[in-house]
Swiss-Prot record:
It catalyses: Endonucleolytic cleavage of RNA, removing 5'-extranucleotides from tRNA precursor. This is Ribonuclease P protein component 4. It comes from the Archaea. Zn(2+) binds at C68, C71, C97, C100. Changing R22A: 40% reconstituted RNase P activity. HAMAP family: RNase_P_4 (MF_00757). The gene is rnp4. GO terms for cellular component: cytoplasm; ribonuclease P complex. Belongs to the eukaryotic/archaeal RNase P protein component 4 family. Part of ribonuclease P, a protein complex that generates mature tRNA molecules by cleaving their 5'-ends. Binds RNase P RNA. Optimum temperature is 70 degrees Celsius. Its cofactor is Zn(2+). Binds 1 zinc ion per subunit.
């Protein structure tokens, strides 16, 4: 009985590991293709999101901010995305998708705090 439970746990972990590898591969392909074929890059992102939902895994942090949450376009700063730093209230990065106009805000307070600690 214990062996069956261990095997199930191992299978779940293995499936999640494979899913994360595939997601990473799809995002890497999207990054390569995005400049000359944005539609194909968008399809790669959509496939990665489908895998993520099916396998119930999180998208790796390095890819999470590289696509538009609304239209699933792979974002390239200066081409189809505008990136701005804002310091009012709480310091944050503003990424605007130039395809659909969606605005994403990400705080960077943690980085500012680390910088202050190093300065003192």
């Amino acid at each position: 009985m214990v062996d069956i439970v261990k095997r199930r746990d191992w299978e779940k972990k293995e499936k999640k590991k494979i899913a994360i590898e595939r997601i990473d591969t799809l995002f890497t392909l999207a990054e390569r293709v995005a400049r000359y074929s944005p539609d194909l890059a968008k399809r790669y992102v959509e496939l990665a999101l489908e895998i993520q939902k099916k396998a119930k895994v999180k998208i790796p942090r390095k890819w999470k901010r590289r696509y538009c949450k609304r239209c699933h376009t792979f974002l390239i700063p200066g081409v189809n995305a505008r990136v701005r730093l804002r310091t009012k209230r709480m310091p944050h990065v503003v990424i605007t998708c130039l395809e659909c106009g969606y605005i994403m805000r990400y705080p960077y307070l943690r980085e500012v705090k680390q910088k202050r600690k190093k300065a003192t």
